[in-house]
Regions:
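N-terminal nicking endonuclease/strand-transfer module with a His-rich metal-binding environment
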Residues: 1-173
Length: 173
């Protein structure tokens, strides 16, 4: 996420503000906030408050090419699920993974979408490390992203999930 406009667009999609063409409203009641934004906040206000807490930004500006946020989509697919699969258990494992990898304080929100073709979680992270924005501290290279996939599998294998399309990049429509 490289702009405040992108934060706004993510917020509108994740919290179902306005028309969402690929969402089925009949299932929207099943969506759930796993990690909640503070009451009355948006991704923009959450980001601004986080930066105001950092002494570094009292004397420094945000770089023009800075990554302001990261968004991850965590999914369990729809085929080949174990008979005893529990969405609640998967959500808890996913939440723990996010908190362990990025720190609870850096997570703006995690929202479960059950109203699209494949159930998934959108997690928005403000990548703060050592008192300043640093996406590179969390994802220095492609291998780090691959390692993240492997770590996520370690968390979710207990609920019976196996990775399907390992390292596949999916463009969200």
């Amino acid at each position: 996420i490289h702009s405040m406009q992108a934060f706004s667009a993510k917020f509108k999609h994740n919290y179902r503000i306005g028309a969402i063409p690929n969402a089925n409203e009949a299932y929207s009641h099943m969506n759930e906030q796993i990690i909640r934004l503070p009451a009355g906040e948006t991704y923009n206000t959450f980001f601004e408050k986080k930066l105001m807490e950092l002494p570094y930004y009292e004397t420094h500006k945000i770089r023009k090419n800075a990554t302001l946020g990261l968004e991850f989509m965590l999914s369990y697919g729809t085929s080949g699920l174990p008979k005893d699969f529990s969405v609640k258990e998967w959500m808890e494992k996913s939440k723990q993974f996010l908190m362990d990898q990025f720190g609870k304080e850096n997570i703006a929100s995690a929202v479960l979408h059950m109203d699209e073709g494949t159930p998934h979680i959108h997690a928005v992270i403000i990548p703060i490390k050592d008192g300043k924005l640093s996406a590179r501290a969390f994802l220095p290279d492609r291998q780090a992203m691959r390692d993240l996939h492997t770590k996520y599998y370690q968390y979710t294998k207990e609920v019976g999930l196996e990775p399907e399309n390992r390292y596949m990049h999916i463009q969200h429509q």
